[in-house]
Amino acid sequence: ALWKNMLKGIGKLAGQAALGAVKTLVGA
């Protein structure tokens, strides 16, 4: 249960980081 929430949080952070990278590449 706890590790599932942790994975969810990590996935969210990774998703946001990926979105930021894509936005940076597109904006460059």
UniProtKB/Swiss-Prot annotation:
One of its GO terms (cellular component) is extracellular region. It holds the Pfam family DD_K. One of its GO terms (biological process) is killing of cells of another organism. It is found in: Secreted. Keywords: Amphibian defense peptide, Antibiotic, Antimicrobial, Cytolysis, Hemolysis, Secreted. InterPro entries: Dermaseptin_dom. The keyword Secreted applies. Expressed by the skin glands. It comes from the Eukaryota. Antimicrobial peptide, active against the Gram-positive bacterium S.aureus, and the Gram-negative bacteria E.coli and P.aeruginosa. Has hemolytic activity at 612 uM. Belongs to the frog skin active peptide (FSAP) family. Dermaseptin subfamily. This is Dermaseptin-6. It comes from Phyllomedusa tarsius.
